[in-house]
Amino acid sequence: MAQKPTSTGPSQRQQRVAELVRHALAEVLQRGDIQDPVLGTHVVTVPEVRMSPDLKLATAYVMPLGGLDEAPVIAALERHRKVLRQAVARRVNLKFAPELRFRRDETFDEAARIDRLLRDERVQRDLDSAPEDDEPETGTGH
């Protein structure tokens, strides 16, 4: 009997469906199909969607361009969750239309935090004083 792989990451199918859902959501938001005052005044990006293993739940990570306050945008998306789910169902051929959940995309914040850490004076000092192991040794050395 074949055993399931023990990897904990998303399967290839989850990744493929997540990308299809991401494209569908991005298209609906870009076209302005949802009539909402908040969504009408914000350009919303969908950098990532994660699917549950059974493909019945899609978590969309969203971020308004320009770093504007994302709370009203997420609230507006939640209000229109049903319409967005129907729009995704029309664009993505699945047995079940996934339930949509919206979360704030924190990758930019995490990247900024790492950048601040790397620019920290103590880290710079450590990086500058690190031994350079990459230089080739000269000599016959055995």
UniProtKB/Swiss-Prot annotation:
<feature type="compositionally biased region" description="Acidic residues">
    <location>
        <begin position="129"/>
        <end position="142"/>
    </location>
</feature>
<protein>
    <recommendedName>
        <fullName>Ribosome-binding factor A</fullName>
    </recommendedName>
</protein>
<dbReference type="InterPro" id="IPR000238">
    <property type="entry name" value="RbfA"/>
</dbReference>
<dbReference type="InterPro" id="IPR015946">
    <property type="entry name" value="KH_dom-like_a/b"/>
</dbReference>
<comment type="function">
    <text>One of several proteins that assist in the late maturation steps of the functional core of the 30S ribosomal subunit. Associates with free 30S ribosomal subunits (but not with 30S subunits that are part of 70S ribosomes or polysomes). Required for efficient processing of 16S rRNA. May interact with the 5'-terminal helix region of 16S rRNA.</text>
</comment>
<dbReference type="GO" id="GO:0005829">
    <property type="term" value="C:cytosol"/>
</dbReference>
<dbReference type="InterPro" id="IPR020053">
    <property type="entry name" value="Ribosome-bd_factorA_CS"/>
</dbReference>
<comment type="similarity">
    <text>Belongs to the RbfA family.</text>
</comment>
<keyword id="KW-0690">Ribosome biogenesis</keyword>
<comment type="subunit">
    <text>Monomer. Binds 30S ribosomal subunits, but not 50S ribosomal subunits or 70S ribosomes.</text>
</comment>
<dbReference type="InterPro" id="IPR023799">
    <property type="entry name" value="RbfA_dom_sf"/>
</dbReference>
<keyword id="KW-0963">Cytoplasm</keyword>
<dbReference type="GO" id="GO:0030490">
    <property type="term" value="P:maturation of SSU-rRNA"/>
</dbReference>
<feature type="region of interest" description="Disordered">
    <location>
        <begin position="123"/>
        <end position="142"/>
    </location>
</feature>
<dbReference type="Pfam" id="PF02033">
    <property type="entry name" value="RBFA"/>
</dbReference>
<dbReference type="GO" id="GO:0043024">
    <property type="term" value="F:ribosomal small subunit binding"/>
</dbReference>
